[in-house]
C-alpha cells in the first residue's frame, strides 16, 4: 500500500500546474496555520519539526505559498539527478535549501531574521545525535533542531502531511512544543529531543502506511551515535 500511495502523492508533488495558493488548495487542506502565526509572532524564528510521512516536501511549497520565508534543511540524495530535481522543485515554489551540517551560521541567521526552517528528524543519519526512545526502541535521533531551538529561542512547531482515502492532501500544524530548560544542557538536549520524537511517533502511528519504513531507523546501537 505504501508504494501505491507514494505514486499518488508523487504526482501531486511533481505537478507543474501550481501557480498560487488557490491552485494548491484544490487538493491540499491546511489545518492549524494559526499555530505557526502565534509562534512566528514571537519574533525569534520558527523551526518546523516534521518527518518523512506522505508528500513531506509539499509542506514547504504550502508554507511558501502562504508567504512564509522558509528554508528546508536536509541531506543531499545520493543520485545527483534526483537531488537536482528535488532542489529545483523547492526553489520553483519559493522555498530554499540548506545542506545539513554545512552552513550552521546561515541557519542561525535565518532564525534571527524571523524566518522559518523545516527540519526532519526521523532518520538515522551520520550527524550529531542522541539515543532516545522511538516506538519502544532506542533510536539515534538528530539533535540539530534541538540545539538550534535551545540556542536561539526559536519556536518549534510540529507538523506533518498525509493523504486521505479520497487522495486529498492534509497538512496539520500543531501548537509550539515548549522546551525544557533546567540548566543542565546535556540532559535538556536529551529531554527535548525525546519530546520531538514523541510527536513524530504520534504522526507515524496516525498514518503508518505513509511513513518510509524501508529506512533503517534503528541501525545505530547505543554508544555508536555521532556526538
Specify the residue positions occupied by each region the protein language model found.
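A conditional alpha-helix N-cap/helix-loop micro-motif detector
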Residues: 28-30, 79, 97-100, 138-139, ...
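Catalytic core of membrane glycerolipid acyltransferases/transacylases, capturing the structured
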Residues: 42-101, 113, 127-130
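Membrane-anchoring hydrophobic helices of lipid-metabolizing enzymes
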Residues: 10-50, 86, 94
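Single conserved hydrophobic/aromatic residue that forms the stacking wall/gate
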Residues: 1-13
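Short, flexible loop segments at the rims of nucleotide/cofactor-binding pockets, characterized by
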Residues: 22-28, 75, 92-98, 135-136, ...
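Short amphipathic alpha-helical segments and helix-helix/interface helices
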Residues: 36-37, 60, 86-87, 107-108, ...
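Non-catalytic C-terminal accessory region of glycerolipid acyltransferases
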Residues: 40, 65, 101-227
